[in-house]
């Protein structure tokens, strides 16, 4: 029942899962507890100490609703490959994690509950990892790899992604993490001047 944002941060092929502070968990804690004061206290502890402990009664509610497992990048790529071969469905890396953990659940639990896995993103947002999952090597830049994925699978590239190559890049600045407080101060000063 301990949530600790001080843990090591790992980058994976599923970047939406690479987080240290989960706002979805905050909402879930409120939905299950109905106690905004408790959730505010936990979030304050997280902000000030980097960690909090979920009370036993709330942890019991979480455990009654959820089953958890782990899936690394290799497992996700293997899931992408098996889903493609067995179901001819091209899934993204996040969905592959869900699929892999769903298979773990089915192996470890004889309750015969139905399992629903919802796709959360286009495989074309992660074309290199998806290509590797179906046994191909990615070649070229992200746009080349999207075309390669389409050529290998026949799955259409979404129009919003297919048109990106010819669009103008709007944001070119890269700010190093160490420079962020300075950049934030600069932006706030600029915003203030703009409204004067």
Residue positions per predicted region:
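Conserved small/polar residues in nucleotide/adenosyl-binding loops
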Residues: 185-192
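Catalytic phosphate/nucleotide-handling subdomain of diverse soluble enzymes
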Residues: 100-164
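Active-site-adjacent helical/loop segments in soluble small-molecule enzymes
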Residues: 34-112, 170-177
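Glycine-rich phosphate/pyrophosphate-binding loop at beta-loop-alpha junctions
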Residues: 1-46, 118-134
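Long, charge-rich low-complexity segments
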Residues: 159-184
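Alpha-helix initiation and N-capping motif
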Residues: 21-25, 36-39, 59, 73, ...
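Short beta-alpha connecting loops at secondary-structure transitions
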Residues: 7-16, 62-65, 167-169
């Amino acid at each position: 029942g301990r949530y600790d944002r001080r843990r090591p941060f790992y980058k994976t092929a599923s970047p939406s899962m690479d987080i240290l502070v989960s706002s979805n968990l905050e909402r879930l804690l409120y939905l299950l507890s109905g106690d905004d004061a408790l959730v505010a206290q936990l979030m304050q502890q997280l902000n000030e100490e980097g960690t909090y402990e979920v009370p036993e009664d709330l942890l019991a509610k979480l455990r009654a609703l959820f089953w958890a497992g782990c899936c690394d990048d290799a497992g996700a790529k293997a899931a992408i490959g098996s889903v493609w071969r067995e179901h001819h469905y091209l899934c993204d890396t996040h969905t592959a994690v869900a699929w892999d953990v769903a298979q773990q659940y089915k192996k470890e639990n004889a309750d015969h509950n139905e399992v629903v896995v919802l796709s959360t993103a286009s495989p074309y947002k992660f074309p290199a990892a998806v290509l590797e999952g179906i046994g191909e090597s990615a070649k070229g830049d992200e746009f080349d790899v999207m075309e390669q994925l389409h050529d290998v699978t026949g799955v259409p590239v979404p129009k919003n992604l297919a048109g990106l190559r010819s669009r103008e890049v709007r944001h070119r600045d890269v700010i190093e993490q160490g420079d962020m407080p300075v950049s934030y101060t600069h932006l706030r000063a600029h915003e203030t001047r703009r409204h004067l």
